[in-house]
C-alpha cells in the first residue's frame, strides 16, 4: 500500500506542479502588464485572435 501510495503522490506532484506553473504563466500573459516580455513572443501562440 505504501509503495503505490507513494507512486500516486509522486505522479500527482509530477503532473500538478508543471500544470500550476503553466496556469500561472497563462494568467500572467492574460494580464499583459506583468509579462510584456512574454506577450510579444507568445502572441501568435497564445493570442491568435489579436
UniProtKB/Swiss-Prot annotation:
Q: Which InterPro entries match?
A: PSII_PsbM, PSII_PsbM_sf
Membrane topology qualifier: Single-pass membrane protein
The identity of this protein, by name, is Photosystem II reaction center protein M
Q: Which gene underlies this protein?
A: psbM
Pfam families registered for this protein in UniProt:
PsbM (PF05151)
UniProt-listed GO biological process terms: photosynthesis, light reaction
Function as written in the Swiss-Prot or TrEMBL entry? One of the components of the core complex of photosystem II (PSII). PSII is a light-driven water:plastoquinone oxidoreductase that uses light energy to abstract electrons from H(2)O, generating O(2) and a proton gradient subsequently used for ATP formation. It consists of a core antenna complex that captures photons, and an electron transfer chain that converts photonic excitation into a charge separation. This subunit is found at the monomer-monomer interface.
Q: Which residues form a coiled coil?
A: none
> Per UniProt, which keywords does this protein have?
Membrane, Photosynthesis, Photosystem II, Reaction center, Thylakoid, Transmembrane, Transmembrane helix
Describe, as the record does, how this protein assembles with itself and its partners. PSII is composed of 1 copy each of membrane proteins PsbA, PsbB, PsbC, PsbD, PsbE, PsbF, PsbH, PsbI, PsbJ, PsbK, PsbL, PsbM, PsbT, PsbX, PsbY, Psb30/Ycf12, peripheral proteins PsbO, CyanoQ (PsbQ), PsbU, PsbV and a large number of cofactors. It forms dimeric complexes.
Family in the record: Belongs to the PsbM family.
Q: Which NCBIfam families match?
A: PRK14094.1 (NF010694), PS_II_psbM (TIGR03038)
Amino acid at each position: 500500500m505504501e509503495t503505490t501510495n507513494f507512486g500516486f503522490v509522486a505522479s500527482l506532484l509530477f503532473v500538478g506542479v508543471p500544470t500550476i506553473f503553466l496556469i500561472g504563466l497563462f494568467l500572467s500573459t492574460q494580464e499583459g502588464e506583468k509579462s510584456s516580455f512574454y506577450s510579444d513572443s507568445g502572441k501568435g501562440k497564445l493570442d491568435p485572435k489579436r
